[in-house]
A protein has these predicted regions:
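Gly/Gly-Pro- and Ser/Thr-rich, intrinsically disordered tail segments characteristic of DNA damage-repair
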Residues: 1-205, 210-211, 328, 332-336, ...
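DNA-contacting surface of Y-family translesion DNA polymerases
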Residues: 171, 179-323, 330-347
Length: 347
């Protein structure tokens, strides 16, 4: 979807159409969740501090997040997808991979399915969507972002290598700011230069992701579309009302986060044995600390001591804390579940 949350707000509030808006909290502690395309022209983007966003775009209009509305629309969109295929891998509330090699409508060309889905979303929901069509997930994702908003891009196998050659490395999946900077230091600015490196050379520079970059530069991505992907983690976070350095106050917020996390775990019927603490500082730098335990983390009594221990290992006195986050995930080795044993009683 195109600037999904912001597009919904502009659809439902005609006075906001054509204006720069941000979905999120306008307060000095606020963060932009989604920015409209009008706002993006000023350099406003998601995860940006509201203060910085307003500095870049003084006329920016903030609207509150209405997650229940967005989820309902997302469900409608997925119902449209299911009219064509059940091989669907959701990536987020507004994005998914579809494998339409075999489809319910017996439509021969994938591009025609993409056109039909875009048409139905426009007619049924009055929203625009962008679609990418190609022979693997890497290229389909690149294509979907290529002509936003309301775009449709097809990358045919015969065109793939030329397309990738011109692609800046920042557009490659798995290449963030740090990796891009390292690639630039090696003289790698696009797919053509990336392709000139050996697999061994890329692995030496980037670890196991080097092999992935090697394949991507050659248009290779063998990942299948995974239906009903198992949820890997459950978490929650909160931006504090003011930056804090006092551990006693941070402990209060940590306790409240633990209670919220326990409730989310209960609702999601999720069990895991790895607890991760995320701390974002006032300069927007962040660190994470994780701990693996033997038994599932499902209750306050199990999670709170681990959370406190993780926080104790982080220096918060020299840099004020802006945000705390907690999440539970599953370790690769799994966890031990105590076995109930019936005791024998002598009478």
């Amino acid at each position: 979807m195109d600037a999904f949350f912001a597009a919904v707000e502009q659809r439902d509030n005609p006075e906001l159409r054509g204006k720069p808006i941000a979905v999120g909290n306008e307060g000095h502690r606020g963060v932009v969740s989604t920015a409209s395309y009008e706002a993006r022209r000023y350099g406003v983007h998601s995860a940006m501090s509201s203060v910085v966003a307003l500095r870049r775009c003084p006329q920016l209009i903030f609207t509150p997040v209405r997650m229940s509305v967005y989820k309902e629309i997302s469900e409608h969109i997925h119902s449209i997808f299911h009219d064509y295929t059940d091989v669907i891998e959701p990536l987020s509330i507004d994005e998914a991979f579809l494998d339409v090699t075999e489809n319910k409508q017996d439509i021969e060309l994938a591009v025609d399915i993409a056109k039909d889905i875009k048409r139905r979303i426009r007619e049924e929901l009055n929203l625009t969507a962008s679609a990418g069509v190609s022979y693997n997930k890497f290229l389909a994702k690149i294509a979907s972002d290529y002509r936003k908003p309301d775009g449709l891009c097809v990358i045919h196998p015969s065109q793939a290598l030329d397309f990738i050659a011109r692609l800046p490395v920042e557009a490659f999946w798995g290449v963030g700011a740090v990796t891009a900077k390292k690639m630039h230091s090696m003289g790698i600015y696009n797919g053509a230069v990336l392709r000139s490196y050996s697999k061994g050379g890329l692995i030496s520079a980037f670890g196991k992701m080097g092999a992935v970059y090697y394949d991507f530069a050659r248009g290779i991505d063998d990942r299948p579309v995974v239906v009903d992907r198992e949820r890997k983690s459950v978490g929650c976070e909160r931006t504090l009302e003011e930056d804090l350095t006092r551990r006693s106050l941070l402990s209060v917020h940590l306790y409240q986060l633990v209670l919220e996390l326990v409730e989310r775990l209960r609702r999601g019927k999720f069990e895991g044995n790895v607890l991760t603490l995320k701390v974002k500082f006032s300069d927007f730098s962040q660190i994470t600390r994780s701990r693996t335990v033997a038994q599932p983390l499902t209750s306050k009594t199990r999670i709170l001591p681990v959370a406190k221990s993780l926080l104790a290992d982080i220096d918060v006195e020299h840099m004020a804390v802006r945000l705390l986050g907690l999440s539970v995930s599953k370790s690769a080795a799994g966890f031990h579940r105590p076995v109930a044993v019936q005791l024998e009683l002598d009478f």
